[in-house]
UniProtKB/Swiss-Prot annotation:
The gene is thiG. GO terms for biological process: thiamine diphosphate biosynthetic process. This is Thiazole synthase. The active site is at K104. Catalyzes the rearrangement of 1-deoxy-D-xylulose 5-phosphate (DXP) to produce the thiazole phosphate moiety of thiamine. Sulfur is provided by the thiocarboxylate moiety of the carrier protein ThiS. In vitro, sulfur can be provided by H(2)S.
């Protein structure tokens, strides 16, 4: 797949990425399936969970070698953290292990919905930004929280579409669209809850800057095919946004213009 133009690239923290797809690396049926999915999606970044990888043992011995072969920028995350101290410590460890100051900040406040802890998220983001991290916080579509995260020094946000792993798509279209409208110059990556490529296409049509996928791909019957489908959906949605879609209207409008009367009506001989 080719980009719409060489100029239409995703830019985060001053760094450009050729793809607007970010791909998670957890819960694939095999390392080969993960490798095939990365090749199919051609993501701009792949996320890695330090806590999960450290506990994976010998079964995942080839995981990091696989990532090196694909040569895709890594975005470590703080998945599984429930306190500010856990998140900050995990981020610092990830910086040492992966040799990057990029971090996707996850701080879960509820085990049932896996909803982010908004108060802790802001405090953790503040600490990590001061420590030199490029923080991409996983948050909800709450506009006030989003602004507080920006005030804390975050330059891009990752609002959810729906709770992690549900595949429900966009549960609050109004909230996400308002977030996009009110923060027009902030990179926004929709993260979590997307289930099928049409969900990704939809948010890209609304002007979001990218999507992060994991469960929708890794738990598909054929992950590689789904990864490719999502990449195409993202590209289609982005193209539609740039094309400038027509406004929806309440009344019908003929698509073919009518000028004058048909020639066979003009002589009055028609039945």
């Amino acid at each position: 797949m080719t980009p719409l133009s060489s100029a239409d690239t995703l830019t985060l923290h001053g760094q450009t990425f050729a793809s607007r797809v970010l791909l998670g690396t957890s819960r694939y049926p095999s390392l080969q399936s993960l490798s095939d999915s990365i090749a199919a999606a051609r993501p701009g970044m792949v996320t890695v969970a330090l806590r999960r990888q450290m506990n994976a043992g010998a079964a995942e011995a080839g995981f990091f070698e696989l990532l090196k072969r694909h040569d895709v920028p890594l975005l470590p995350n703080t998945a599984g953290c429930q306190t500010i101290a856990e998140a900050v410590t995990t981020a610092q460890m990830a910086r040492e292990v992966f040799e990057t100051d990029w971090i996707k900040l996850e701080l879960i406040g509820d085990d049932y919905t896996l909803q982010p802890d908004p108060v802790g998220l802001i405090e953790a983001a503040t600490l990590l930004v001061k420590d030199g991290f490029k923080v991409l916080p996983y948050c909800t579509e709450d506009l006030v929280i989003a602004r507080r995260l920006l005030d804390a020094g975050c330059e891009a946000l990752m609002p959810w579409g729906a709770p992690i792993g549900t595949g429900k798509g966009i549960v609050n279209p109004y909230g996400l669209r308002v977030l996009r409208e009110r923060l027009p110059d902030v990179p926004l990556i929709v993260d979590a809850g997307l289930g099928v490529p049409s969900h990704a296409c939809q948010v890209m049509e609304w002007g979001f800057d990218g999507v992060l996928l994991n469960t929708a791909v890794s738990q598909a019957t054929h992950p590689e095919i789904m990864a490719r489908a999502f990449a195409r959906g993202v590209e289609a949605g982005r193209a539609a946004y740039l094309a400038g879609p027509m406004d929806a209207r309440e009344s019908a409008h003929a698509s073919t213009p009518v000028v004058g009367m048909p020639f066979w009506h003009q002589d009055g001989s028609h039945a």
